[in-house]
């Protein structure tokens, strides 16, 4: 973790062996250096206490209980680092137990091990820098091949150079006759290398500036060449040019960041703090442990075996040492990225171990779940579906989600109203889904807005407040008009639900963030809650009519059409209710033409040119009917209008009623607001 200009940020880079040692090593007040894990043990099988120098050693990682050493002694914890005390008998410091979450250890490897990320991940950084095929390097890393004269600048006794198989050469039988066992071991380590040692020596021998210069010259030669006319050759040249560009970029990055390429080969293996790879005791002495502990144990077992072989190298066959080096490499590979080479290491239940890469990568890994994005309490997530029956400021919240989000409020309501005596009883009622909890939940939700958010939140309308209502199912119901602000549609989009807890957050949500108060785009000022797509198509179908005016067809055929029967006349209705009743009884249909009695004081919008009546009918008492294309006027003998009828459809009447109710509701709300403001001014 580094700090730059007072902004905290995280930078991931290669660590040198010295840096790994500094992470883990400490000097105790008695001068003893601790930090190296040498034993593959975890907890003692009888006492369940950490084994000394093992993966949970209190001397290395700190005490399990604050202020209590491994002997069981207790001393007060000193806040100043200079005054920290430790037990002279067991070497454990008297400090807080939470240090076990931060303090690291390390394993000193008997042979260098190549970091599998930089070898097997694409692109392979080691293959790019060394300009060698990946398969060739893999054979070298896993000890299938040997490298003669890994350091070419020094004089050599061997005429061999490059890769070869160990058993194919006769020198291994000839040279031991001229050297002592110790001398032959020194000669072999200098002249021949395999495994991570061979890779490390080649990387150490690299001159990065020369790599850049040579790659640049080769790229210029290819750039000056013209097309060969052969598509296969041109592709081959282009791939080579791309490889040279990657090599130049990689070498420049190493130079700029002051990182040495040989650090891609490990000689010290960091051991994570114990709290990040816990071992938990269940009932009856049963233990469960993190997979990392098993992988660390395997590394230590194989590393200690290799140390024993090297300690008695005179009596150990060379092939056995080489085989053990390969096993150490494979154990470290499994710890870092299990299964990257094919078949993963598995436990006794044939389940692959979870390696370090599995813990940090992916959606549920350490970075995406705990660092880049964090799980939030009092929040949920579900798919959205259309809810056209909802007002603009409401949303439908599934019962299952609502009872989980508002559980704390429901529990308080149950206990406060004496429906439950305590917390456990209230939780039991919720788990059993007793009917009373839904009533309490509805009362809690009435005055509590919720926040809906759809990622990515690119502007302030990406998160809006709504008044929740309970709905069945598992999907969130949303009014289609608010989709514009969220840039959402109903093809599987998901939205997050958040509960504002503090009074300030609830007030902000209610006063500023409710959806019906965010109708304009903050960027352009234009309306953003406008009908589109399905809504426009639905409005068109609702308001369309089969015949335009009485010219199209003066009479509509009835459902039971018979050419011999007379056409039924267009029906007359005196109110909206009569129309809806007839529509419900299927006497008329949405697109059926009808005459609706209109209020006399409402103006009828006609064409700009004054329209003349199509027909005028006179009655015996002097009353008259003036029939126009879209309306009728009934007048008395004094030519005063008695009634007005307009030609429309049931669908248009339904649409008009919704518009009227919306306008009246807005008008009433504005009157209430004015009255409220006037009262405040008077009281002020």
Curated annotation (Swiss-Prot):
This is DNA-directed RNA polymerase subunit beta'. In plastids the minimal PEP RNA polymerase catalytic core is composed of four subunits: alpha, beta, beta', and beta''. When a (nuclear-encoded) sigma factor is associated with the core the holoenzyme is formed, which can initiate transcription. Binds 1 Mg(2+) ion per subunit. Its EC number is 2.7.7.6. Its main location: plastid. It catalyses: RNA(n) + a ribonucleoside 5'-triphosphate = RNA(n+1) + diphosphate. The gene is rpoC1. It comes from the Eukaryota. Its cofactor is Mg(2+); Zn(2+). Keywords: Chloroplast, DNA-directed RNA polymerase, Magnesium, Metal-binding, Nucleotidyltransferase, Plastid, Transcription, Transferase, Zinc.
């Amino acid at each position: 973790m580094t700090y730059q200009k007072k902004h905290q940020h995280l930078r991931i880079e290669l660590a040198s062996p010295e840096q790994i040692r500094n992470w883990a090593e400490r000097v105790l007040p008695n001068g003893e250096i601790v930090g190296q894990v040498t034993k593959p043990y975890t907890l003692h099988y009888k006492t369940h206490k950490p084994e000394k120098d093992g993966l949970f050693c209190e001397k290395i990682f700190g005490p399990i209980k604050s202020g209590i050493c491994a002997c069981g002694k207790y001393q007060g914890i000193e806040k100043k680092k200079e005054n920290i005390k430790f037990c002279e008998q067991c070497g454990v410091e008297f400090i807080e137990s939470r240090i076990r979450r931060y303090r690291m250890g390390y394993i000193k490897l008997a042979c260098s091990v190549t970091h599998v990320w930089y070898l097997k991940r694409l692109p392979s950084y080691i293959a790019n820098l060394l300009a060698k095929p990946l398969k060739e390097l893999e054979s070298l890393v896993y000890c299938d091949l040997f490298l003669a004269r890994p350091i070419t600048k020094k004089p050599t006794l061997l005429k061999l150079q490059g890769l070869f198989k160990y058993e194919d050469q006769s020198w291994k039988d000839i040279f031991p006759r001229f050297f002592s066992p110790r001398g032959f071991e020194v000669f072999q380590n200098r002249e021949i290398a395999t495994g991570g040692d061979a890779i490390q020596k080649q990387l150490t021998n690299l001159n990065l500036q020369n790599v850049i210069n040579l790659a640049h010259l080769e790229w210029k030669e290819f750039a000056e060449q013209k097309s060969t006319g052969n598509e296969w050759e041109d592709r081959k040249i282009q791939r080579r040019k791309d490889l040279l560009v990657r090599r130049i970029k990689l070498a420049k990055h190493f130079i700029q960041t002051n990182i040495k390429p040989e650090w891609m080969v490990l000689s010290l293996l960091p051991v994570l703090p114990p709290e990040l790879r816990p071992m938990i005791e269940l009932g009856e002495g049963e233990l469960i442990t993190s997979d990392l502990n098993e992988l660390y144990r395997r590394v230590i077992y194989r590393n200690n075996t290799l140390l024993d072989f090297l300690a008695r190298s005179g009596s150990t066959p060379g092939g056995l040492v080489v085989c053990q080096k390969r096993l150490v490499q494979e154990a470290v590979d499994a710890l870092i990225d299990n299964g990257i080479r094919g078949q993963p290491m598995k436990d006794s239940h044939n389940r692959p171990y979870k390696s370090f890469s599995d813990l940090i990568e992916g959606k549920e890994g350490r970075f995406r779940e705990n660092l880049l994005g964090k799980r939030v309490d009092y929040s949920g997530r579900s798919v959205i579906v259309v809810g056209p029956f909802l007002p603009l400021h409401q949303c439908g919240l599934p019962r299952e989600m609502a009872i989980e989000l508002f559980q704390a409020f429901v529990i308080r309501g149950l206990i406060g109203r004496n429906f439950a005596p305590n917390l456990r009883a209230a939780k039991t009622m919720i788990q059993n889904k007793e009917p009373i909890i839904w009533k309490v939940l509805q009362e809690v939700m009435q005055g509590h807005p919720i926040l809906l958010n759809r990622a990515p939140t690119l502007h302030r309308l990406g998160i809006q407040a709504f008044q929740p209502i309970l709905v069945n199912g598992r999907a969130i119901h949303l009014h289609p008009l608010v989709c514009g602000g969220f840039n959402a549609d109903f093809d599987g989009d998901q939205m997050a639900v958040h509960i504002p807890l503090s009074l300030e957050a609830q007030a902000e949500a209610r006063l500023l963030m409710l959806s019906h108060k965010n109708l304009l785009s903050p960027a352009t000022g234009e309306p953003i809650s406008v009908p589109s797509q399905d809504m426009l198509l639905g409005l068109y179908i609702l308001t369309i009519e089969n015949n335009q005016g009485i010219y199209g067809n003066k009479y509509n055929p009835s459902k039971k059409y018979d050419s011999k029967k007379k056409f039924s006349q267009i029906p007359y209705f005196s109110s909206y209710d009569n129309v809806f009743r007839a529509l419900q009884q299927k006497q008329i249909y949405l697109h059926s033409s009808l005459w609706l009695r209109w209020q006399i004081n409402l103006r009828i919008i006609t064409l700009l040119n004054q329209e003349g009546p199509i027909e005028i009918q006179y009655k015996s008492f002097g009353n008259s009917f003036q029939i126009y294309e879209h309306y009728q006027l009934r007048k008395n003998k004094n030519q005063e209008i008695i009634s007005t009828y307009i030609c429309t459809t049931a669908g248009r009447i339904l649409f008009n009623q919704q518009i009227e109710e919306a306008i009246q509701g807005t008008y009433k709300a504005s009157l209430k607001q004015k009255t409220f403001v006037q009262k405040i001014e008077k009281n002020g």
